[in-house]
Design a protein with these regions (language model features):
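Short hydrophobic/Thr-rich beta-strand motif most characteristic of the beta2 strand and flanking loop
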Residues: 25-32, 40
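Active-site beta3 strand of CheY-like receiver
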Residues: 44-50
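C-terminal output helix
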Residues: 106-115
Length: 122
């Protein structure tokens, strides 16, 4: 089963991601603390990351850069899912290494298409 790591400090959001990812046949790895994300990722080796941006340190921008510095995650797709709907945040996230940027609230089909598209590229 394909592992997808979700890092979001909002427990309601991670519960929703757990439900929708399992329904699509993925194995979600859920974290509400970004500080643990890199160490857990090295153990679990997810095929894709879904990150929120607005989290306590490290925030999603910094976490994205941290993941890209790790050799095993240089090419792992990262999808940002955030309430920040401004061009500057989008530019910074893509510059930090994100592959896609979805804004909350998002449509489930939008998320599914992004996940499938990025996993097919691997």
């Amino acid at each position: 089963m394909t592992k997808i790591m979700v890092v979001d400090d909002d427990k309601d959001a991670t519960s929703l991601f757990e439900e929708v990812l399992k329904a699509e046949g993925y194995e979600p790895i859920l974290l509400n603390e970004s500080v643990k994300a890199v160490s857990v990722a090295k153990k679990e080796l997810p095929a894709l990351f879904i990150l929120d941006l607005m989290m306590p340190e490290p925030d999603g921008f910094k976490l994205c850069r941290m993941l890209r510095k790790e050799p095993e995650f240089r090419n792992t797709p990262i999808i940002i899912v955030t309430a920040l709907n401004d061009t500057d945040s989008r530019i910074v996230a893509i510059g930090a290494g994100a592959n896609d940027y979805l804004t909350k609230p998002f449509r489930l089909d939008e998320l599914y298409v992004s996940i499938k598209d990025h996993l097919e590229d691997l």
